[in-house]
C-alpha cells in the first residue's frame, strides 16, 4: 500500500480523462503509482490516450461512457468495481460541460444537460462508488469544482450553480462518510490552459472576459492542468489524512482578490 507521499497500490476512477484537466489528473495519479480507470464519450481519444499512457508504463484502462445517462453511469461503476475487485481508493469527479449564455437564454435542454453531467453524474457516481470506497478502508472522493461556484462569472449562471451545489455536496458527504474512512474534498480551478479555453477565446467577448479573470490573478497567468492535478494527488495521499470537507482553489490567487 502507498507510503505517505505516493499512491502505490491505490486504485482510482477519474471521469473525463481523455483531455484537459482530466488527462492531467490521470497522468499525475498514474505516475505516482496508482492504477487508474477513466472514461470519455470519444473512443478514438481514449485509444490515443491509452497508447500514450502505456508507452510511459502507466497502469490505465478506459471505456466509453456518456455520463448524462444514468444507466451508463451504473454500467461504468460495475465495470470499475469488477476491474478493481470491489475496492476503490479514489474517485475523481472531473467530467463537466459549460454552455456560455445569459441566464435568460438557456433552454430546458441546455439546463438539463449541464445539470445532469456536472452535478447529477457526480452525485450518482459518488453514491455508486461508496461501497467500494468503504471496502478499500481508505477512500477519497475529489470533486473538480470551479471558482465559478463562488464568483459570478459572465455567461456561466447554470454552470456556476452546478459547482456551487457540488461544493455543498462535498461538505455534506465529508461529514456523512467520515465514519467509513472516506475523505471528501473539492478542488476549484481558476483559468486553466485547456482545449476548452482555446475554443472559448475564439469569441472576442469571451476572450475579453477571460483576460479580465487572468488580470485578477495574483500570478497573472493561466494555470496548467498538471498544477491542478498535483493538488488532486495531494488530497489523495495518506499524508493528507486530516483534510476533509474542504474546497481548495488552484487559481493563481484569483479568489484572494477582492476586485481592486
Swiss-Prot record:
InterPro entries: NAD(P)-bd_dom_sf, Sc_DH/Rdtase_CS, SDR_fam, TR
SUPFAM superfamilies recorded: NAD(P)-binding Rossmann-fold domains (SSF51735)
Role according to the record: Catalyzes the stereospecific reduction of tropinone to pseudotropine.
Catalytic residues in the record: 159 (proton acceptor)
UniProt protein name: Tropinone reductase 2
Residues given in the record as substrate binding sites: 146
PROSITE patterns tied to this protein: ADH_SHORT
Gene3D superfamilies (UniProt xref): NAD(P)-binding Rossmann-like Domain
Gene label: TR2
One record GO biological process: tropane alkaloid biosynthetic process
Pfam family name, one: adh_short_C2
Organism: Datura stramonium
Pathway where it operates: Alkaloid biosynthesis; tropane alkaloid biosynthesis
Catalysis: reaction(s): pseudotropine + NADP(+) = tropinone + NADPH + H(+)
Binding-site positions, NADP(+): 18-41, 192-196
Any one GO molecular-function label of the UniProt entry: tropinone reductase activity
Record has Oxidoreductase as a keyword: yes
Amino acid at each position: 500500500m502507498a507510503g505517505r507521499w505516493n499512491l502505490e497500490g491505490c486504485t482510482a476512477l477519474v471521469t473525463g480523462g481523455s483531455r484537459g484537466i482530466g488527462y492531467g489528473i490521470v497522468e499525475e495519479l498514474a505516475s505516482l503509482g496508482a492504477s487508474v480507470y477513466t472514461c470519455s464519450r470519444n473512443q478514438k481519444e481514449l485509444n490515443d490516450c491509452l497508447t500514450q499512457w502505456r508507452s510511459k508504463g502507466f497502469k490505465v484502462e478506459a471505456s466509453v461512457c456518456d455520463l448524462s445517462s444514468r444507466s451508463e453511469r451504473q454500467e461504468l461503476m460495475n465495470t470499475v468495481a469488477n476491474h478493481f475487485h470491489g475496492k476503490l481508493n479514489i474517485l475523481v469527479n472531473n467530467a463537466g460541460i459549460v454552455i456560455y449564455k445569459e441566464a435568460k437564454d438557456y433552454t430546458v435542454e441546455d439546463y438539463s444537460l449541464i445539470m445532469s453531467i456536472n452535478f447529477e453524474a457526480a452525485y450518482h457516481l459518488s453514491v455508486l462508488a461508496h461501497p467500494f470506497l468503504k471496502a478499500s478502508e481508505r477512500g477519497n472522493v475529489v470533486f473538480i469544482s470551479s471558482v465559478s461556484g463562488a464568483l459570478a462569472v459572465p455567461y456561466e449562471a447554470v454552470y456556476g450553480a452546478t459547482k456551487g451545489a457540488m461544493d455543498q455536496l462535498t461538505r455534506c458527504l465529508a461529514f456523512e462518510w467520515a465514519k467509513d474512512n472516506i475523505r471528501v474534498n473539492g478542488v476549484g480551478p481558476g483559468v486553466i490552459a485547456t482545449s476548452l479555453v482555446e475554443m472559448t477565446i475564439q469569441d472576442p467577448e469571451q476572450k475579453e472576459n477571460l483576460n479580465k479573470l487572468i488580470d485578477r490573478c495574483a500570478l497573472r497567468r493561466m494555470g496548467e492542468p498538471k498544477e491542478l492535478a498535483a493538488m488532486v494527488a495531494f488530497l489523495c495521499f495518506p499524508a493528507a489524512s486530516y483534510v476533509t470537507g474542504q474546497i481548495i482553489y488552484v487559481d493563481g490567487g484569483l479568489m484572494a482578490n477582492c476586485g481592486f
